[in-house]
Design a protein with these regions (language model features):
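Conserved beta-strand-loop-alpha-helix junction that forms the acyl-donor binding cleft
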Residues: 135, 160-170, 187-191
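Conserved N-terminal entry element of GNAT/NAT acetyltransferase domains
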Residues: 3-9, 26, 30-57, 200-202
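Conserved active-site tyrosine of GNAT-family acetyltransferases
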Residues: 174, 179
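Short, solvent-exposed amphipathic helices
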Residues: 1-12, 16-23, 27, 68, ...
Length: 202
């Protein structure tokens, strides 16, 4: 009876119901409904995200966000404090840049582009941190895009970064942006177990 009723409906419509259901199943197999909902929410929330250049008023935010994520897994190292306590002197005055992500007007993420004194690498992408309550909105990726765009403005050729494979969302973002893992690893931090590079294309 159900089959007959469905066939009657199919005859009364322009599209074959079973074909439509099959197409839905194919699309959902490629990407789940939950994933589609998350992506739609992320796109909607991006309207409330803005990246601005660093100002001294964000010094405490720059430090606190970085301390927060580092101490979740590791300890703060002296090399960290050089940059976190003195961002103007150690990053900006040396030719680098810091970016601050605002969500609904509040600072929730930071990222630095540090000028490198290196024969191969022009800048290091570093100090990327997003407040836990603001994670999942694509803010980290947006900050990375801002840093890469600035590097392009500065005619940089290759970017460098150091991270840890425990930070799976961050590693996924870096790979999505085109960063490739380096075969040799000479970490500047104890927590560093992966180094990557991005060859910028114009």
């Amino acid at each position: 009876d159900v089959e007959v009723a469905v066939e009657d409906i199919s005859k009364e419509t322009r599209h074959d119901l079973w074909s439509a259901i099959g197409e839905w199943e194919d699309r959902l197999a490629e990407k789940s409904l939950l994933q589609r909902v998350k992506e739609a929410r992320k796109m909607r929330e991006r309207e409330h995200i803005r990246v601005i250049p660093y100002e001294p008023c964000y010094k405490n935010t720059f430090k606190s966000l970085n301390v927060q994520w580092i101490t979740q897994h590791w300890k703060i190292e002296p090399h960290d404090l050089d940059y976190l306590d003195h961002p103007q002197e150690y990053i900006i005055n040396k030719g680098g840049f810091i970016f601050v992500a605002l969500y609904r007007g509040k600072p929730v993420g930071v990222c630095a582009l540090c000028k490198m004194d290196d024969p191969v690498y022009d800048y290091e992408l570093a100090k990327l941190a997003v407040h836990p309550h603001a994670q999942g909105k694509g803010i980290g990726e947006i900050l990375c895009h801002a840093a890469i765009d600035k590097a392009k403005d500065m005619k940089a050729k290759i970017l460098f970064l150091e991270s840890n494979t425990l930070l799976k969302p961050a590693i996924h973002t870096y790979k999505k942006l085109g960063f490739k893992e380096l075969a040799e690893n000479h970490p500047a931090y104890e927590r560093g177990n992966i180094q990557m590079e991005l060859k910028i294309t114009y």
